[in-house]
Curated annotation (Swiss-Prot):
This is Benzoate membrane transport protein. It is found in: Cell membrane. The ben operon encode the proteins responsible for the degradation of benzoate to catechol. GO terms for molecular function: benzoate transmembrane transporter activity. GO terms for biological process: catabolic process. It comes from Acinetobacter baylyi (strain ATCC 33305 / BD413 / ADP1). The chain crosses the membrane at residues 16-36, 49-69, 74-94, 99-119, 139-161, 176-196, 220-240, 252-272, 301-321, 325-345, 368-388. Probably involved in the transport of benzoate.
Amino acid sequence: MTTLLKTLKQDWSLSATIAGFLAVLISYSGPLIIFFQAAQKAHVSTEMMISWIWAISIGAAVTGIFLSIRFKTPVVTAWSAPGTALLVTLFPNISLNEAVAAYITAAIVIFLVGITGYFDKLLKWIPQGIAAGMMAGILFQFGLGLFLATDTLPLIVFSMLLCYLISRRFSPRYCMLWVLICGVAFSFFLGKMNPVPLDFQIARPQFIAPEWSWFSTLNLALPLILVSLTGQFLPGMAILKLSGYNTPAKPIIAAASLASLFAAFAGGITIVLASITATLCMGKDAHELKDKRYIAGIANGLFYVLGGVFAGSIVALFSLLPKELVAALAGLALLGAIASNIKIAMQEDQQRDPALITFLATVSGMHFLGLSSVFWGMCIGMLAYFILLKPKAS
């Protein structure tokens, strides 16, 4: 333990801590809104809503900290945002107890997929250009969001963009910190902060008994398994691979699904490997040295602990920020990741067409057969890859 603490102290950096904080900030300011919508549809109490947030925050914290320390890799976990969107469409046709049962079913199935090793084999089968095209497509909307935010709060967004350019030139390591300070300062002085009452209190998790039904299993558990594996773990592992980390999928999926199992009883949806926010912790902005970026994963987990303990209060605090500031912050923070993934996708001449098809299908937002554009981008891109590049029979 003493050796571990000494190593953590030596490797700690402010830039990695900021990267971890920004990942939590974006998670709470974006996907968490879907949770509020689901809670309203389910007509749950404020106490139950806080329990949900406590469960997903602590679940993401424990897995992220453990895996980041274990593999010295910036492993960032979160809750399934696509799965949460499913809840909005299903409530109030299913009860909260049925939803919890579906979470448990999904966690068990995902755990079995992880420990059998089949997911690792699937990951090795996907070419780097296809994975990069998919990731660029996922992140592209955030780059667009940066400039779309100028429609409503142009002064704040353009000031953040200018601050980004200046700090990238003179203080690149703490660039995003200056951008955050700039955005908050302009929002405050222009009176654009959201009027949210702050009341700091400790969260108390609520136990929810599961109630199995075929309806919730087929309409929530099964889609949750698919979107978690194809829309979260798959791009999440692809990001790790593209960032130069060869962490196996088996322990990550196993740890996340076990955390999901326990979080479910407090109302927490499936814990998954983060894809979008993970890029914040894996680039040079987190740390110049790749081997020291794991601190960002640990910092991310620690901020999630704070978010879980003060669930209601922390969410209210993040809710102060205007959505345009959050959109601009996310877009600027992910510019480097967007550029690097587009570069990798277009790097090899042979893979360029399949990678471009993957990118366009992913960024399209298509939902054919109810499955996400991430899934279809990967499938269509792989189909193009095998048709165009498979050796012809002599």
